[in-house]
């Protein structure tokens, strides 16, 4: 696994996330796939308490899916407004699902409130435009995250190290979008030339 996350849940429970190459998916197939995942975490030398994770008992489901984006250009039609995953979702590598949904709810509810106050039909164009740009920025952020976190081999490791040093030195890039919100970064953080400079050899 090139990228993994461990989330303590309280009461001695953990939620584990791991990324693996499609070529390795058979390693996590079959009825014992949960035990295989726990075993993979146990082999991570960099993970504190890896032995304790290996000795744990799986209690939840094992879900595996490919990381990708899905969206529609206009999540509205007469009498209907789609929000959250129904309107399209971001590659889960940067964990934005709930944040996207909550922002959608806020924007749509404000439009509905304002239309009711003005006794007029709601105009969802601002929501459609804002969401399109937000999702575009998150799509770019997820693509960079995938390149840095989930590509495999020595070249990928070297690229991660270079990019990490550049980010630590203050070089502009899109990675903070998943922490502070994509709208809070300047537009140039998402320009192709910015990404190229961040990932360059």
Regions found by a protein language model. Give the residues of each.
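Conserved FAD-binding catalytic core of PHBH/FMO-like flavoproteins
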Residues: 1-63
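Short linear sequence elements within intrinsically disordered, low-complexity coil regions
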Residues: 9-12, 22-25, 67, 129-132, ...
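Noncatalytic linker/hinge segments flanking ATPase motor cores
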Residues: 19-24, 45-62, 105, 121-128, ...
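Short secondary-structure transition/capping segments
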Residues: 21-31, 95-98, 161-175
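Generic detection of long, well-ordered alpha-helical segments
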Residues: 27-35, 102, 124, 153, ...
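Conserved mid-domain beta->alpha element of the FAD-binding
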Residues: 61-144, 148
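C-terminal helical "tail/cap" subdomain of flavin- and related membrane-associated enzymes
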Residues: 110-201
């Amino acid at each position: 696994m090139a990228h993994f996350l461990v989330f303590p849940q309280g009461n001695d429970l953990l939620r584990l996330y791991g990324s693996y190459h499609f070529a390795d998916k058979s390693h996590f197939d079959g009825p014992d796939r949960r035990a295989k995942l726990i075993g993979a975490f146990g082999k991570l030398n960099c993970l504190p308490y890896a032995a304790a994770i290996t000795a744990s008992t799986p209690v939840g489901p094992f879900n595996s899916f490919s990381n990708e984006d899905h969206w529609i250009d206009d999540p509205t039609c007469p009498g209907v407004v789609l929000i959250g995953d129904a309107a399209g979702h971001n590659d889960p590598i940067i964990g934005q699902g709930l944040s996207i949904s909550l922002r959608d709810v806020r924007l749509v509810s404000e439009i509905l409130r304002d239309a009711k106050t003005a006794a007029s039909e709601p105009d969802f164009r601002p929501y459609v435009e804002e969401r399109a740009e937000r999702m575009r920025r998150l799509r770019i952020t997820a693509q960079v995250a995938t390149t840095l976190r989930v590509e495999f081999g020595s070249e990928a490791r070297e690229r991660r190290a270079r990019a990490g040093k550049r980010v630590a030195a203050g070089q502009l890039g899109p990675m903070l979008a998943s922490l502070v919100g994509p709208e809070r970064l300047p537009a140039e953080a998402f320009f192709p030339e910015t990404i190229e400079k961040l990932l360059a050899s």
